[in-house]
Amino acid sequence: AAISLPLGYTTGKEYAELEWPIDILIALVWISYAIVFFGTIGTRKVKHIYVANWFFCAFILAVALLHIVNSAEMPVGFMKSYSAYAGVQDAMVQWWYGHNAVGFFLTAGFLGIMYYFVPKQAERPVYSYSLSIVHFWALIFTYMWAGPHHLHYTALPDWAQTLGMTFSIMLWMPSWGGMINGIMTLSGAWNKLRDDP
């Protein structure tokens, strides 16, 4: 990417600029990462799967799915391709990818880190295991549908725009659920923020 983009080799799709050979390499690396992660989960000795691993699982699966679907292209040369989608379908797939790649790459990944490190550093369990279940499934269910909010007042059908907007507004619920769980896990251990690097 550091070489191909300055040389002008790009698909012209926001957040998905890389051409097909690089997309294939990224997919192979990500699938290898998934094999290592799920292989480790599969061979664990402890029956329980820690909450953080749910978020890492969603992070890995969602980013792989998003990258592979959005990168479906017809190569016409070594560093030139055209999207497998056209028109409003291309825009919808692109913003399903653009919104969720950021959402799952950053949000789910960082929440996994939070659900691991905050309880560990606070030396206490997660405040509410039940809230973490609700937080996880609410995030997974609502985030995937929020991409169309990037396409308001476009050729995208009104129902899809409304659905995207509705699910974007609903995202406050998992956001607050995770925040409450993190803050309440730290409750009584606020000195850790000051004393523990």
Kindly give the residue locations of the regions a language model identified:
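Helical transmembrane-bundle signal
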Residues: 1-4, 26-36, 60-70, 112, ...
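Membrane-interface loop-to-helix entry segments
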Residues: 22-28, 48-62
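Alpha-helical transmembrane segments of polytopic membrane proteins
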Residues: 19-29, 95-108, 162-174
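Juxtamembrane membrane-water interface segments of multi-pass membrane proteins
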Residues: 6-17, 36-54, 72-94, 107-134, ...
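Catalytic-domain carbohydrate-binding cleft regions of carbohydrate-active enzymes
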Residues: 21-24, 129-145, 155, 159-162, ...
